[in-house]
Amino acid sequence: MKYAKIELERDDVHKRFGGGIPLCSIIHIEGEESSGKSILSQRLSYCFLQNSYSLSYISTQSTTTEFVKQMTSLKYMINKKLLNGNLLYIPVYPLISDNTQKDDFIKKSMTTRAFYEKDIIIFDCLSTLISNDASEVQVGDLMSFLKRIASMNKIIVYTINPKELSDQVVTMLRTAATMVIKTETFSFGGNLKNSAKIVKYNMAAGPFQKVMVFRVDPGLGIAVEISSVA
């Protein structure tokens, strides 16, 4: 089994995730709004790029300019990766208010070859994109397709807000994934913290921490709390 490196010198995220991410993985990151899904996706995308993997990032959250500014604020510098083509950023931000265009996103996502030419493919936020046509049959087709893509030594990452999908569809997405992470926020000592709980991790490279408590610091990105509270 081969593993993609996710190590950055300034944080310990890679240690919490077992030292690396197995190739052929499908990573499901689930949580409500502002629970930390996107920052985890951004942290993973940056470390993949820093370790010489190419990456497609399909986003409902930000325009290209907004994404670059957000990453820069966290010192996740991606400008050169965009310019040299290692990072393909695809903003679908305008589509989230256009239901007509959203209706066939599942079909479009399986026929847009450019998405899958990179080593890593990230959808943030997948539930927003498929909420209008997320029947069990269509989602089953999508996950079968993503499994075929991942089997070619690629890694698929997607985030979802479970409130945007039916319970049956959320269960299908969790079941199809090789790694499931649930994010949430909580108050501790008067401060708001984020947590990422690994509830499923197939083919882990090594021991991993089931609950990672972290905060987001400007100029640093994710800062793992040493004294984690589960």
Curated annotation (Swiss-Prot):
Gene3D superfamilies: P-loop containing nucleotide triphosphate hydrolases. GO terms for cellular component: archaeal-type flagellum. Mg(2+) binds at residue 38. The keyword Hydrolase does not apply. ATP binds at residues 35, 37-39, 61, 193. Component of the archaellum. NCBIfam families: PRK08533.1. This is Archaeal flagellar ATP-binding protein FlaH. It comes from Methanococcus voltae.
